Amino acid sequence: MDDIISLKNIDYSYYGKIQALKNINLLVKKGEMVGIIGLNGSGKSTLLHIINALIFPDSGEVFFKGNAVTEKSLSDKSFGIQLRQSMGYIFQNPDIQLFCPTVFDELLFAPLQLNLPIKTAEDRAEQTLLFLGIEYLKDRPVYMLSGGEKKKVAIASVLTMNPDILLIDEPLSSLDPKTQTFFIDLLLELNHAGKTIVFTTHHLDLIDHLQPKVAVLSEEHTIRKTGTASEILSDEEFLISVNLIHEHVHKHENGEHKHYHSHYVFHKH
């Protein structure tokens, strides 16, 4: 697989004072699924923002398909369009993303911004509604949607662009168990279809279900370890050291035993 995203020695701070990322190195290959896991405040969302060129690092380099991503390179219209067409970003809070009067308007917005013919945009929107099983929401005002419905519409609005890469910030945030299962199955299906997916999470269970390549962000805002899901999840001492699980000790008459808990657990039904 070819490297589609490359980050080299990335540092980023807010207002030049608050360190958010430190010496980040990460490779994402075409067709990979990559899970960035860490506690709240470790820099996960900031890292996605840098990959998507919403912000630029203080130092270090970002590459997309071998080309440097900078404010200057994005001023080249053809490269800027290529990057924006290739990447779709789903925010943790869908209310940030959704602003059109109706669901169908939301799905039309991105294709029309890419100058697709109106008929092509409408066809894509209809197909995406059917693919996600939300055609019944087509004419619904966005403000009337539930949290789970908004999340589905947010990802639908990105899929109408047919991006090669999906960047998803906390895909299971504020979702009920049934909708969590829907998104787990959807991510697996999209990756199986060839989409490159980079997501952030603090759910170890999600890593276990999706089995992506994993990058662990520490509370010091560095990538402490990368590896397969099984390599990361089986290293209990490491997970304790980055505060992703904690140890419980139970004492009995005949001794004691230890077991481990994730700080964040969801249940798949």
What are these regions (language model features)?
Residues 141-145, 149:
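Conserved ABC ATPase signature
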Residues 234-269:
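ABC ATPase nucleotide-binding domains
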Residues 214-228:
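H-loop (His-switch) and adjacent beta-strand-loop-beta switch element
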Residues 119-137:
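Conserved ABC ATPase "signature" region
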Residues 52:
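Helix-to-loop junction immediately C-terminal to a conserved catalytic motif
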Residues 37-39:
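The feature captures the beta-strand-to-loop junction immediately N-terminal to the Walker
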Residues 201-202:
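H-loop/switch region of ABC-family ATPase nucleotide-binding domains
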